[in-house]
Amino acid sequence: GFHIAEHLSLDDLQTLIKEALRTLKPAGLLILEAPNTENLVVGTSSFYLDPTHQRPLPSALLSFLVGYLGFARSKVLGVQESVPLREEHGPTSLFAVLSGVSPDFAVIAQKAGDASTMASFDVVFAKEYGLTLELLANRYQERFDAIERKTQLLEARLNRIWKLLEPFKWAKSLFQK
């Protein structure tokens, strides 16, 4: 279900998950997508533009619910993020940290089934998807740290240059008198 979960009460959401588990074939998949409140713009602003949203639904809560209610495994995926930000060394501005986290997330939950059918989905469950706040904040910090290292290096070089020029300052003072 795409953008359904955040419109339901917790009781109705649990009923939906239980019914999905009951009706799915063995090793079947339930996919629930919702706004990602880890994205600060979504969590503090755009989520509330839809008055039918019940409450923000953290991905960790939805992932917990599907496991607690009987699904064999689940995976949280970040979705709908900016393509340039997906690149490992994409833009790392402060605004990217605040707004670039995947604006939506999906929880894929798999019902228990025979081992071979379950194994055919292992690749999907092993891969990482989307952009998290931690990932973007770390990218930003790495960029900041690199700039700081370059600044320190330039300051050290400048100090050496000033020391090399010290005798010339003395000579210059002789001619100014």
Predicted regions located by residue number:
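Donor nucleotide-sugar recognition loop
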Residues: 52-54
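Short, solvent-exposed loop/turn segments at secondary-structure junctions
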Residues: 37-39, 79-83, 112-115
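Short, P/G- and charge-enriched loop/turn segments at secondary-structure junctions
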Residues: 62, 91-98
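Short glycine/proline- and charge-enriched loop/turn segments
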Residues: 43-50, 89-91
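Conserved SAM-binding loop
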Residues: 1-43, 56-68, 109
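Conserved S-adenosyl-L-methionine
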Residues: 70-83, 94-95
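Short hydrophobic/aromatic beta-strand or adjacent loop that forms the aromatic wall/cage
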Residues: 101-107
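Boundary detector for helix-to-coil junctions that initiate low-complexity/charged tails
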Residues: 108, 112-177
